[in-house]
Amino acid sequence: MAAAVVVAGEAAAAAAAAGAGGKKRGASRSWILFDAAGEERVLDADKYAIMHRVDINARDLRILDPLLSYPSTILGRERAIVLNLEHIKAIITAEEVLLRDPLDDNVIPVVEELRRRLAPSSATQHDVEGAEEDESPFEFRALEVTLEAICSFLGARTTELESAAYPALDELTSKISSRNLDRVRKLKSGMTRLNARVQKVRDELEQLLDDDDDMADLYLSRKLAGAASPVSGSGGPNWFPASPTIGSKISRASRASAPTIHGNENDVEELEMLLEAYFMQIDGTLNKLTTLREYIDDTEDYINIQLDNHRNQLIQLELFLSSGTVCLSLYSLVAGIFGMNIPYTWNDNHGYVFKWVVLVSGLFCAFMFVSIVAYARHKGLVGS
């Protein structure tokens, strides 16, 4: 594999050919290029140079701008595949791969994997492995690297979230505190954001799998070979590029039984198998997040039940205190009545009346309190 070199002149020439002389050039961005021969180069090119090199429009290139917020997207164009998968922003053609911001910490593992996967087969490899390598087009090998990288990245983030969330939720159920509640709140916010990112990647893969025409657009090598040789291997004309709707009605079972030199234009089985593998992987990641969300919801329900129980206990305490207050108020009422400085004759020479008043009033108030509590228990207003 050739060492990486900085090619600034090539980028400048491409930019001059793409833009008008009086127009302002776009800001240069760092790209790394891998070609089918296994060589890699670092390009410091502006957007006009990239647009001219891979033949895409400015709208497609804008999707790869890290300063703009675009959802995960896989676009098939005439000569390129535009990939925006989280931090992986790449353009794949039939002969080369351009990866943006190769020095980013999250992109470096992708660069290493592309360097390993796209290297030419060595002579020491088994013939079977070499044959399998040759069967897969260059753009599919590059696409597989990016899909594997993004699925592994999101899977790792999900695993990290699970390892932090489950202990925090268990701790919250055992002890409800402001610190634990704030910790779970932050974890739930992170889970919601991660769930949206995983869901978008999954939806993009599902959308591709549901549309055979979109998958056929990703066969860049086939389109390139068809443009160079418009006649199929059987000698007949190739009608499929002119009538894609007819080709989309052919069943997948019949596609494999009618190959041409460059492959049936409607045979998307190879790409379908590739996408299905990573669709299942990202779907498994989404299922983990769904399970975590359900666990969080169950924990919230459990905490709400605990809070309701504490609230009921406070209501019971309030009932006891209110009942006691009413009884004491009646007792105070009797004491207030007899404490008034009003002359009445029946109190003369009857000192024992004080004892009876105090005793009867106290017993009556106690009986009244017990009656209120017994009635509340009978109606189920307080626990047994």
Swiss-Prot record:
Role played = Magnesium transporter that may mediate the influx of magnesium.
Name of one Pfam family that matches: CorA
Residue numbers of motif Required for magnesium transport activity?
339-341
Extract the SUPFAM superfamilies matched here.
Magnesium transport protein CorA, transmembrane region (SSF144083)
Task: Output the InterPro entries linked to this UniProt entry.
Answer: CorA_TM1_TM2, MgTranspt_CorA/ZnTranspt_ZntB, MRS2-like
Location in the cell: Membrane
- The protein's gene is named MRS2-I
> What keywords is this UniProt entry annotated with?
Ion transport, Magnesium, Membrane, Transmembrane, Transmembrane helix, Transport
Where does this protein come from, organism-wise? Oryza sativa subsp. japonica (Rice)
Residues annotated as transmembrane? 319-339, 356-376
PANTHER family linked to this entry: MAGNESIUM TRANSPORTER MRS2-2-RELATED (PTHR13890:SF31), RNA SPLICING PROTEIN MRS2, MITOCHONDRIAL (PTHR13890)
- Gene Ontology CC: membrane
Q: What is this protein called?
A: Magnesium transporter MRS2-I
For biological process, the GO terms are:
magnesium ion transport
Family that this chain belongs to:
Belongs to the CorA metal ion transporter (MIT) (TC 1.A.35.5) family.
Q: What membrane topology does the UniProt entry give?
A: Multi-pass membrane protein
Cite the GO molecular-function annotations of the record: magnesium ion transmembrane transporter activity
Gene3D superfamilies attached here?
2.40.128.330, Magnesium transport protein CorA, transmembrane region
Which residue pairs form cystines in this protein? none
